[in-house]
Amino acid sequence: SYLPYQKGVYFPSTADKEKISVGAERQRRYRVIRKLRSEPTEEHLWETVLLYCGVQFKTYSGLPFTYEIRKGRSGEYTKELWIDRRGKSKSLAWSSVLLALGNIKKVGEVVERPKALSDIRGVTYIYGMFYRFGLIDVPKEVKEKKNDRGNKKQKKGREDMLEENIKFFRRL
């Protein structure tokens, strides 16, 4: 090959994530999310969950987590998500995810808290995933937690700097 690139855009949709470019991966995610939102079925959800392996999500309280899906002896994916939070893995059964999907009344509806989806093990992780996939919406306070970047000291430092800038420009 004449090109020094290891990743490309022009691979079939079945190509591994390692072979496609970041832009192509983003396009795949966009398409699968659009399909899931228009028709929230088990197949579309499974396709979305597979594409989002390794992507960081946040729980209801704003704690980050990722998940992976392992392959079984036959080479097929197992229907079990392994949630990785601070180096510890917890398993989440696919049936729990489907139960929560069945409890969503309307796509885009505001769900106040994770337990509103269902009283199942791992629902805080499912809540974060469904919000990211656009299946549910969350209250404003929760959005602020999920979008909060940095710790409180950094935030306080940014606020102090902003106040100093405002005072400086008022003097001019």
Describe the function of each predicted region.
Residues G23-L172:
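Intrinsically disordered, charged low-complexity linkers and terminal tails
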